[in-house]
């Protein structure tokens, strides 16, 4: 025992090392557990959403939005080395963070699946989660990385591909 029993570890208490929930896994499954429309229900076709940067937290919103508009949502897979390697040729700078570099592979994956409409908005301001929050803006990379994708993934120059990357502030209900 620790002298004086002032340390909560010293009096014989042990942490429960079993049954510890993996909250990251729980959140990930909750965010990405939506089932897209079947092709016959998706009268407007498919929309591709890359599983990158700000699209993690906002995916439930965008999935619901496009599903209500009768699009079949195609989500890129979980990031891995193969996804990274798919987009490596279009990465313009080594100075970007790794999550941003992954975005190139996710968009390329969607294109290789035959998705002709890809939606990847630029979000400078996120929604206010609680009133005490004094700022809720994304870093400059997250805010505008879709512009980088648009200008560096050559396949997006194909006139049959629609790449939408509007600048939207989720704090403004008008947008």
Task: Report residues per predicted region.
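An N-terminal assembly and electron-transfer interface module characteristic of large anaerobic redox
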Residues: 1-175
